[in-house]
Amino acid sequence: MGLIFFRYDRCYMLSVLSYLHVYFGPFRLLQSYAVLMGIALYAGFFFTYGVLPSAYRFLPQDRGRAFAPCAQEAAGKPTGAGVIFVSVFVLLVYLLMRPSFVHALILLLTWGVMLTGYLDDCAQVCWGEYRKGALDFLFAVLTAALLGHFYFHDQVFWWFPFFSDPVFVSPFLFFAGSVVILWMSINATNCTDGVDGLSGALVLMALLSMGTIFYFLLGNVRAAQYLLVPFVVDGAQWALMSFALAGALMGYVWRNAHPSTVLMGDAGSRALGFFIGVLVLISGNPFLLLMTSGVILVNGGTGLLKVVLLRFFHVRILSRVRFPLHDHMRENWHWSTAQVLLRFMILQGLLTIGLLGVLFKLR
């Protein structure tokens, strides 16, 4: 097994063509995960880019967020575009690979999270915070239990910087930690979806980062042995799924660039946050959430912490800071939409590169 090309053992629709390489040599490239990842990326982009405008008239209209700066800019635009690009993602995965039982479950759960968000986007009255939080918690609990039992078989090992050997994690601790990671990832990503292109661009960076890590590092035996990290047997398949969703998301971000013509809605943001959380759990290092989504967590997650402390413990923190943080930057620091987007992306890029070295080299 080489560093770049992986044998595509469980072939499916496109890879059937690879057997025709005796007649046309280039067909053998369809046995490579690298090629299939490229196909997933480009197919996801062009299909979403082409289909999305024709779906505008069928999508619900944004109601505008109460008390949010510039809410009038979003009001009336088609929203819930997540139903399009998440569905494209699921179809692409089934086209390019034969998902295992766990992969199929994750695809189903991702689509289910998207569906709950889409129903909220379509509702005449916005669902309450407790209702949405309870649904997110339910999906997090279900996913944590399924991964712990069917994927890790109740034998979970996490790897950390400064430790050369993986650390055994009890099933209860894995379950509790996974629920927190998934719930935070879903809601922090949802809170970040308030500036044209911001949430989509940051999640896109996270997906490409995770896909690259799964393919070149965790999913490669030699690289994993060298870095003293556990080898993920199906790492290339998780990488393909990451690139498929990244491609579909690119098609949406193209249309969501300022001034946007469509919004992803809860249908998109919640599903994206959920899938990022799943990738982090599969990787075996919860700190990868900081590496790939650190800006998302600070931008949206800190606001969630502020609300929880105030509402349930009557503890007030950061009272002079508006959350999500991008609202504070626009209202108090007078950043433009383009400045918020570019500066947040730069910060995330710096964070990703810095933590990549810390997590994988300081062993």
Swiss-Prot record:
Q: In which pathway does it act?
A: Cell wall biogenesis; peptidoglycan biosynthesis
One Pfam family for this entry, by name? Glycos_transf_4
Membrane topology summary: Multi-pass membrane protein
Q: Name one GO molecular function term.
A: UDP-N-acetylmuramoyl-L-alanyl-D-glutamyl-meso-2,6-diaminopimelyl-D-alanyl-D-alanine:undecaprenyl-phosphate transferase activity
- Name the needed cofactors: Mg(2+)
Would the keyword Ribosomal protein turn up in this protein's UniProt record?
Answer: no
Write out the entry's keywords from A to Z.
Cell cycle, Cell division, Cell inner membrane, Cell membrane, Cell shape, Cell wall biogenesis/degradation, Magnesium, Membrane, Metal-binding, Peptidoglycan synthesis, Transferase, Transmembrane, Transmembrane helix
Q: Where are the transmembrane segments?
A: 33-53, 82-102, 105-125, 133-153, 166-186, 198-218, 227-247, 271-291, 295-315, 340-360
Q: Which GO terms describe its biological process?
A: cell division; cell wall organization; peptidoglycan biosynthetic process; regulation of cell shape
Locations listed in the record: Cell inner membrane
Entries under CDD domains matching the protein? GT_MraY (cd06852)
Q: Which HAMAP family match?
A: MraY (MF_00038)
What task does this protein carry out? Catalyzes the initial step of the lipid cycle reactions in the biosynthesis of the cell wall peptidoglycan: transfers peptidoglycan precursor phospho-MurNAc-pentapeptide from UDP-MurNAc-pentapeptide onto the lipid carrier undecaprenyl phosphate, yielding undecaprenyl-pyrophosphoryl-MurNAc-pentapeptide, known as lipid I.
Please identify the protein, giving its name as recorded: Phospho-N-acetylmuramoyl-pentapeptide-transferase
Traced from the root, the source organism's taxonomic lineage reads: Bacteria, Pseudomonadati, Spirochaetota, Spirochaetia, Spirochaetales
Q: Which gene encodes it?
A: mraY
